[in-house]
């Protein structure tokens, strides 16, 4: 009783000595800790010199007791119900397929604010540090709920697009179609139909069917009186709620078993299903492979027209090859091989027909108004014209009057064109690559002949004009 009679001197002595207040504890502990300071204060008043040399002993703080006190402070905070509600929403968003939207939490916040205002309850406590902790915790859970909503939307979008892709590429008719007759063909007796008596008499047969690693169990109720139609089976599977069962049917290990298996079931072999799916997925590759062989006529017409329009330089660039491939719906390799063969089978006979006598190496050309019948560079023709004085003299028939060149008559040109068209008509130019040793030898011989022609032209005083004849020859 004497200890509680004089609280004022004790508070004044604590204020002068700047002793920190004891931590928050329960009332029994506070009474127990409050007694030693009062005794110490009484000693301090009676003997001040003794207390100056010895410090005041502080009571040890139990970490477990401090943790429990902090927990009770969080539980008693006014914002704790809102924090609990948000935490439960985050758990619901991660447990089920239906994610809790952030808009619903906004409604919950409004309801919480109205309830606090109606009950005249505060939103914060006397501890600013604890208030800041609660607000930050609510913000973190709010951000977490938003991220869960985004992830759920992405998952739903991916599933919808994947299911749509499966429905378009794996049609039911293609899935069960078997041209050679498979184990699940309607005309084959290998369909294992389990009768009603067998299922009723042997309850273990159901587990044997469901655990069979060689097949996929499909409800027989989806079939219409024995007519196997995968469209009905597929619709039954989708309408049953298991949207991912078609994906499981593709695998060789997984099985699709409905929850309520009917009395009759049909068993489909996984190996045959995988075989049909593989052939279905490789259908596009087979179509592309079927293009090898005879090329379409419209494609050859487009490439032949380009060839005759560029007789001066019948070597398309990479961009021109891509453009021609896009127009003809062919591959770049087919276009490249066609031009390789065309230069040998179409243009080479034209050159041979224009030069019937192989003895003279120097070739004569016609006038400039027919450049499409030339298969030589412009620099050689320009050099010869400059040698004759800049203005070529023409004969009455229109040919250039040059002694060292042989004239290209219209009869020879017509004969060459006919021979080239007949060769092109007989051979379809299938685009297959024919890079053998004979082709390489022919190209080397053509290059040697062109080099010899250039040397002979240089001997006829054409070399002083600085001709560059190798830039346009390949």
Swiss-Prot record:
Compositionally biased spans, kind Basic residues: 361-371
InterPro entries: HD (IPR001356), Homeodomain-like_sf (IPR009057), KN_HD (IPR008422), PKNOX/Meis_N (IPR032453), TALE_homeobox (IPR050224)
Pfam families: Homeobox_KN (PF05920), Meis_PKNOX_N (PF16493)
Family from the record: Belongs to the TALE/MEIS homeobox family.
Biased composition (Acidic residues): 429-456
Gene Ontology process terms (BP): regulation of transcription by RNA polymerase II
Domain MEIS N-terminal: 96-179
Region feature Disordered, mapped onto this chain: 1-42, 351-371, 385-405, 423-474
Keyword annotations of the record: DNA-binding, Homeobox, Nucleus
The name this protein goes by in its record: Homeobox protein PKNOX2
Annotated Gene Ontology cellular component terms: actin cytoskeleton; cytoplasm; intercellular bridge; microtubule cytoskeleton; nucleoplasm; nucleus
Keyword Nucleus tagged: yes
The entry's DNA-binding region: 291-350
Organism of derivation: Mus musculus
Compositionally biased region (Polar residues): 26-38
MF-aspect GO terms: actin filament binding; actin monomer binding; DNA binding; DNA-binding transcription factor activity, RNA polymerase II-specific; RNA polymerase II transcription regulatory region sequence-specific DNA binding; sequence-specific DNA binding
PANTHER family cross-referenced by the UniProt entry: HOMEOBOX PROTEIN TRANSCRIPTION FACTORS
């Amino acid at each position: 009783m004497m200890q509680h009679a004089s609280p004022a001197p004790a508070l004044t002595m604590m204020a002068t000595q700047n002793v920190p207040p004891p931590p928050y504890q329960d009332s029994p502990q506070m009474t127990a800790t409050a007694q030693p300071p009062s005794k110490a204060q009484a000693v301090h008043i009676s003997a001040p010199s003794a207390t100056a040399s010895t410090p005041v002993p502080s009571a040890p703080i139990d970490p477990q007791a401090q943790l429990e006190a902090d927990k009770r402070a969080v539980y008693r905070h006014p914002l704790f119900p809102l924090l609990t509600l948000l935490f439960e929403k985050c758990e619901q968003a991660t447990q089920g397929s239906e994610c809790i939207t952030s808009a619903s939490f906004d409604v919950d916040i409004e309801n919480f604010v109205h309830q606090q205002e109606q009950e005249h309850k505060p939103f914060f406590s006397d501890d600013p540090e604890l208030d800041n902790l609660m607000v930050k915790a609510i913000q973190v859970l709010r951000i977490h709920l938003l991220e869960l909503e985004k992830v759920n939307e992405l998952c739903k979008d991916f599933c919808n697009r994947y299911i749509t892709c499966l429905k378009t590429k794996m049609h039911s008719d293609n899935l069960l179609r078997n041209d050679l007759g498979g184990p699940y063909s309607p005309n084959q007796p290998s369909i294992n139909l389990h009768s009603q008596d067998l299922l009723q008499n042997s309850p273990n047969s159901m587990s044997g069917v469901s655990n069979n690693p060689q097949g996929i169990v499909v409800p027989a109720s989806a079939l219409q009186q024995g007519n196997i139609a995968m469209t009905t089976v597929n619709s039954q599977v989708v309408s049953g709620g298991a949207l991912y069962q078609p994906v499981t049917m593709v695998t060789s290990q997984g099985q699709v078993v409905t929850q309520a298996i009917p009395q009759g079931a049909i068993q489909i072999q996984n190996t045959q299903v995988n075989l049909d799916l593989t052939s279905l997925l490789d259908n596009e590759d087979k179509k592309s492979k079927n293009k090898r062989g005879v090329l379409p006529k419209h494609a050859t017409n487009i490439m032949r027209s380009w060839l005759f329009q560029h007789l001066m330089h019948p070597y398309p660039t990479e961009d021109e090859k891509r453009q021609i491939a896009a127009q003809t719906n062919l591959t770049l390799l087919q276009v490249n091989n066609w031009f390789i063969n065309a230069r040998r089978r179409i243009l080479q006979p034209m050159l041979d027909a224009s030069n019937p006598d192989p003895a003279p190496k120097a070739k004569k050309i016609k006038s400039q108004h027919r450049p499409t019948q030339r298969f030589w560079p412009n620099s050689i023709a320009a050099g010869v014209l400059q040698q004759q004085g800049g203005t070529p003299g023409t004969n009455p028939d229109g040919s250039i009057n040059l002694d060292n060149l042989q004239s290209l008559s219209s009869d020879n040109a017509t004969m060459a064109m006919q021979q080239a068209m007949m060769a092109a008509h007989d051979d379809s130019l299938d685009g297959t690559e024919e890079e053998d040793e004979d082709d390489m030898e022919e190209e080397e011989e053509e290059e040697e002949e062109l080099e010899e022609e250039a040397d002979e032209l240089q001997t006829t005083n054409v070399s002083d004009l600085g001709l560059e004849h190798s830039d346009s020859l390949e």
